[in-house]
Curated annotation (Swiss-Prot):
Chief location: membrane
Keywords, alphabetical: Coiled coil, Membrane, Transmembrane, Transmembrane helix
Keyword Cell wall biogenesis/degradation included in the entry's annotation: no
Homology family: Belongs to the SMCO4 family.
Stated name of the protein: Single-pass membrane and coiled-coil domain-containing protein 4 homolog
Coiled coil: 1-31
């Protein structure tokens, strides 16, 4: 069997499926990853704030 030279053409169906997969992945990124990063950022800011504030003398 001979191998084809160059890139193999993508059919319309394959291209459509790939685009749908990319849209699903982007939706997951927006609904899972970004909120998780937001929570981590809030914890980091809170941690730094609590560690750098002056001690309260009782």
């Amino acid at each position: 069997m001979r191998q084809l030279k160059g890139k193999v053409k993508e059919t319309r169906k394959q291209k459509k499926e790939r685009k749908l997969d990319n849209l699903e992945t982007q939706a997951k990124i927006r609904t899972v990853v970004l909120p998780a990063l937001g929570v981590l950022a809030v914890f980091l800011v809170l941690f730094v704030y609590l560690k750098t504030r002056p001690a309260v003398l009782a």
